[in-house]
């Protein structure tokens, strides 16, 4: 580890292979906590490259719980968090809209870190069993079309690092890579990030991970979701090409909605918002979900255009299919699934 620390002190970038090896060392129980802390802080101070992010993601996915990965066409629509906006659970609500539109959703998430309610907190409040094993997750993806992967359970080797992150209380590379460490081999992905300057590096990592299509967004006001407040900065990965662009919500018929208007609350309050959206209630929450789910359906290829994606998202809700997926996941995740373990 000393060699890598010296390079970082000198402001040098690590190669992908060096970062992969450093990542394995970070996960080794024999490494000193002071070395982990120094590495994370020095890397952040230098600034992370796409090669470094990918190297660490490789190490984390290698040490994650093993998956059979026989499920084809899975997608995740996870944000990094860290925007401090305290919005309701946009991507988790959108996940059921995607599932209702026929997309297999492997939703990777955690409890609240910078917000009041994380995806795990919301789903637990709604009655979903968040403790599914890899075999159960495969079963749910195949038979329900949506499954939740509780990040701490999927990545047991990260327990020590999470403790050190909490003690450091400063942003590190781990604030950025959550959506990239999903242990399922995803075909497509929709990622929201709070740091605009990391849009391109994250898209490059998704390309290295073999995503067929992906969309990375930094919302207006530096939201880690697509925002109805104004211009959204976007990077699209398609046909192995990366294109940078921007998207205005007014172009798709949405009214401007300030980010403060879509603030959430505790898990009970956010569950009420999610159920309202999935039940077809008209609101700024619904419009925000339609915009995000529409973009995700475009990123997935289920929709050929963003307009078509928004139309499909609205149909998923208004037909009752999105809510049906939630109810199906609640029932199936709480069943005895010993037959698949």
From Swiss-Prot:
Binding site for Mg(2+) 1: 91, 225
Pathway: Amino-acid biosynthesis; L-tryptophan biosynthesis; L-tryptophan from chorismate: step 2/5
GO cellular component entries: cytosol
Protein residues bound to anthranilate 1: 79, 110
Catalytic activity: N-(5-phospho-beta-D-ribosyl)anthranilate + diphosphate = 5-phospho-alpha-D-ribose 1-diphosphate + anthranilate
The EC number(s) this enzyme carries: 2.4.2.18
InterPro entries (alphabetical): Anthranilate_Pribosyl_Tfrase, Glycosyl_Trfase_fam3, Glycosyl_Trfase_fam3_N_dom, Glycosyl_Trfase_fam3_N_dom_sf, Nuc_phospho_transferase
Superkingdom classification of source: Bacteria
One GO BP: L-tryptophan biosynthetic process
Bridged cysteine pairs (disulfide): none
Chain residues that bind anthranilate 2: 165
Coiled-coil region: none
Residues engaged in binding 5-phospho-alpha-D-ribose 1-diphosphate: 79, 82-83, 87, 89-92, 107-115, 119
Top-level EC class: transferase
Cofactor(s) listed: Mg(2+)
Cofactor annotation comment: Binds 2 magnesium ions per monomer.
Family in the record: Belongs to the anthranilate phosphoribosyltransferase family.
Function: Catalyzes the transfer of the phosphoribosyl group of 5-phosphorylribose-1-pyrophosphate (PRPP) to anthranilate to yield N-(5'-phosphoribosyl)-anthranilate (PRA).
Protein name in the entry: Anthranilate phosphoribosyltransferase
Organism in which the protein naturally occurs: Bacillus anthracis
Gene that this sequence comes from: trpD
């Amino acid at each position: 580890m000393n060699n890598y620390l010296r390079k970082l002190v000198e402001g040098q970038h690590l190669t992908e292979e060096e970062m992969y090896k450093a990542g394995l060392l970070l996960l080794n129980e024999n490494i000193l906590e002071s070395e982990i802390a120094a590495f994370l802080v020095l890397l952040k101070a230098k600034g992370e490259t796409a090669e470094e992010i990918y190297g660490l993601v490789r190490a984390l996915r290698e040490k994650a719980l093993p998956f059979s990965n026989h499920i084809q066409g899975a997608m995740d629509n996870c944000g990094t968090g860290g925007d401090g906006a305290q919005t309701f659970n946009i991507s988790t609500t959108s996940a059921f809209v995607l599932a209702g539109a026929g997309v297999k959703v492997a939703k990777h998430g955690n409890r609240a870190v910078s917000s009041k309610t994380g995806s795990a907190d919301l789903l637990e409040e709604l009655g979903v069993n968040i403790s599914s094993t890899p075999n159960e997750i495969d079963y749910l993806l195949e038979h329900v079309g949506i499954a939740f992967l509780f990040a701490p359970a999927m990545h047991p080797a990260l327990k020590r690092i999470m403790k050190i992150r909490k003690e450091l209380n400063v942003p590190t590379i781990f604030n950025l890579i959550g959506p990239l460490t999903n242990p399922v081999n995803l075909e497509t992905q929709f990622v929201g990030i709070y740091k605009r300057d990391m849009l391109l590096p994250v898209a490059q990592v998704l390309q290295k991970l073999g995503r067929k299509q992906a969309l990375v967004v930094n919302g207006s006001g530096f939201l880690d979701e697509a925002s109805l407040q104004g211009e959204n900065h976007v990077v699209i990965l398609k046909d192995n090409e990366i294109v940078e662009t921007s998207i205005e919500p007014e172009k798709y018929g949405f009214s401007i909605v300030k980010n403060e208007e879509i603030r959430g609350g505790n898990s009970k309050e956010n569950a009420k918002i999610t159920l309202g959206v999935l039940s077809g209630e008209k609101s700024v929450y619904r419009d925000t979900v339609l915009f995000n789910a529409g973009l995700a359906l475009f990123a997935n290829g289920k929709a050929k255009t963003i307009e078509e994606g928004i139309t499909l998202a609205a149909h998923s809700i208004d037909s009752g299919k999105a809510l049906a997926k939630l109810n199906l996941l609640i029932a199936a995740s709480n069943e005895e699934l010993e037959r698949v373990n």
